[in-house]
Amino acid sequence: MVTTSLSLPEIARETRQASRQLAILTNEERNEALEAIAEALTANADKILEANIADVQTAKAMQLSPALCARLELSPSKLKAAIAGVRDVAKLADPLATMQINRELDQGLILRRITCPLGVLGVIFEARPDALIQITSLAIKSGNGVILKGGKEAIRSCQALVTIIHQALSQTKVNPAAVRLLTTREEIQELLKLDQYIDLIIPRGSNEFVRYIQNNTRIPVLGHADGICHLYIDKEADLSKAIRITVDGKTQYPAACNTIETLLVHQDIARQFLPAVAQALEEKKVKLLGDEATRQMINVPSATEEDWQTEYSDLILSIKIVDSLESAIEHINYYGSRHTEGIVSENFNTAKTFSDRVDAAGVFHNCSTRFADGFRYGFGAEVGISTQKMPPRGPVGLEGLVTYKYQLVGDGHIVADYSGENAQSFTHKDL
């Protein structure tokens, strides 16, 4: 952990206390803290990039995967975008103290449901130092403390970022203890046991990593274990659109969890579509795999059962020919990870059937699955993507980091007056 003699439970307790102070600050005070962070990150950009270059060099020397190295790299443009994201979060509406219910139960007895912070977030992530910036800004805006654990491959970048963030917060109303960084793998095990201090764990990383977190804590976990996304090219697709959407969905950022891993193609247009899309993908250095029907039309290696279950996070794409919309939906609902699925079709009814029947957090029509992102949704940023059925679902921004409490105000009201033979009636009138 970063230069402290405190034990992890003591750090978590301090973060809990700091989060309670943060929760009662005004929106203006929280926004001032975000602006201070943005200014400090800008002023110290060279230090951040220098630390990141050292991390990337070490990762390459250790022969870590190209996908991980791509996530790890914090280019000047990436850092600039992350800083802009901090300011975008500050511009968002205040998620706290929103009145969701304002109801008269009886004269003088008023029930209100008010949004409030969750408390303390434990966020564990691999690579992606820009995620630390996003998460911190969302935590502060939503009034939550946050304990961060980055991957060892990003340790220099994360330490530089948190040091700068602490310096910025020390000049604001936000206690720097609201943002803490852990640096050793052993601390993950201990963090997962701190259910008395941590309200939500958010893991970001490989499917094995996320499943490990889910299986080793009593703390609620928000996240997704897999990003196996599909694109279905319908028999009534505009093929030029289909090619552009396929190429973007696979190559725009192959390491992202919303990148397509399997392309499903209707048999009626496969012979016309596959050679054209294969050429476009191969120009982008994508390795293609195909089922037997696909291999009769284009020269590619065989796709196996394992391929339909694999999140490549790389320039690899499996292709399968299907005989109907129903077959495509069946394949997706069996192999998909409930993340993001897409269809290309000019038939509105076909697209609606697909959207209604596919089980996923996001279902897209005639656009790239890469749009599944909190920033692109207008959330300012995201702490992660959730594929679980219980909310929040999909990209999780500010709304997913707040809960609510019921506040009931009366004037000597007691339940005994509302029970028995002469019970008073409730008015239950929304105000």
Curated annotation (Swiss-Prot):
Swiss-Prot/TrEMBL catalytic activity: L-glutamate 5-semialdehyde + phosphate + NADP(+) = L-glutamyl 5-phosphate + NADPH + H(+)
GO molecular function, one term: NADP binding
Signal peptide: none
Gene Ontology CC, one term: cytoplasm
Keyword Amino-acid biosynthesis appears in the UniProt entry: yes
UniProt entry tagged with the keyword Membrane: no
GO annotation (BP), single: L-proline biosynthetic process
EC number: 1.2.1.41
Task performed by this protein: Catalyzes the NADPH-dependent reduction of L-glutamate 5-phosphate into L-glutamate 5-semialdehyde and phosphate. The product spontaneously undergoes cyclization to form 1-pyrroline-5-carboxylate.
UniProt xrefs under PROSITE patterns: PROA
Record protein name field: Gamma-glutamyl phosphate reductase
EC top class, as a word: oxidoreductase
Biological pathway: Amino-acid biosynthesis; L-proline biosynthesis; L-glutamate 5-semialdehyde from L-glutamate: step 2/2
Keyword annotations: Amino-acid biosynthesis, Cytoplasm, NADP, Oxidoreductase, Proline biosynthesis
Family to which the UniProt record says this protein belongs: Belongs to the gamma-glutamyl phosphate reductase family.
SUPFAM superfamilies: ALDH-like
Compartments reported by the entry: Cytoplasm
